[in-house]
UniProtKB/Swiss-Prot annotation:
It is a multi-pass membrane protein. It is found in: Cell membrane. It comes from the Eukaryota. The keyword Kinase does not apply. It comes from Homo sapiens (Human). Disulfide bonds join C97-C189. CDD domains: 7tmA_OR5V1-like. One of its GO terms (cellular component) is plasma membrane. The chain crosses the membrane at residues 26-46, 55-75, 100-120, 140-160, 197-217, 238-258, 272-292. Residues 1-25, 76-99, 161-196, 259-271 are extracellular. Odorant receptor. This is Olfactory receptor 5V1. The gene is OR5V1. The keyword Membrane applies. Keywords: Cell membrane, Disulfide bond, G-protein coupled receptor, Glycoprotein, Membrane, Olfaction, Receptor, Sensory transduction, Transducer, Transmembrane, Transmembrane helix.
Amino acid sequence: MERKNQTAITEFIILGFSNLNELQFLLFTIFFLTYFCTLGGNILIILTTVTDPHLHTPMYYFLGNLAFIDICYTTSNVPQMMVHLLSKKKSISYVGCVVQLFAFVFFVGSECLLLAAMAYDRYIAICNPLRYSVILSKVLCNQLAASCWAAGFLNSVVHTVLTFCLPFCGNNQINYFFCDIPPLLILSCGNTSVNELALLSTGVFIGWTPFLCIVLSYICIISTILRIQSSEGRRKAFSTCASHLAIVFLFYGSAIFTYVRPISTYSLKKDRLVSVLYSVVTPMLNPIIYTLRNKDIKEAVKTIGSKWQPPISSLDSKLTY
């Protein structure tokens, strides 16, 4: 009978913002605009880096990968969050929950490692520019990107299997926006010590290690920037580094805070805000931060725009005709 009760759950109820009934439509509008900006900005980056031959460099190769990851992991949860804001039925099937958790953890883990690869790219470009094309060959770039994706995949497989091997004994209400590891561990009626150990271990490998590598890379970059003679050049370089580091601290800070701590310390009502930062806000800010001061991207966008725009002479001839 106990085994039957443990396997009886066929769906989960996502509570999300159910306590804010009067703000449901406002929140839907905010999430919709954020998701629209995320898709638009990241799709533009992918199209630009693929179609412009001048952007076929390691930096933009990694940036294109980052844009694709941001689209995927935002799509894994935000559309469902918007549906639940306007729907009375706020449920997700057991299988749907498995798929959502796997996808989200896969893409978040891959992004953690990819950001470190991007920092390494910037370190070589600024601190060792003469050997940049030799060190960061096409083969190495492909290997780095593939390693990020593979490690993210394996990390997701481990946590998905461990999470859904746990028993769920009747209560199926997830006090969160989507199916994520911490709320499911809290919901489980089994022993989660193995899951917590796995979170801590992978948190060190996928969270803290790449984060520290990024910080060390930017320390070297900043020390090189300080030797730039032009004050204007130093100012622009510092401004770019500061914006990149702001995104890194926001993403890693919220992700590490969410996953790398004991389950007993979780307060899902408070932690929901943190989850919004790295799952909704950061993917929208990435294309802005990484392309705002980038002249190459701006020029490429103008070039693409001019190709889609018909010549004025042809328009005049059509109008006169």
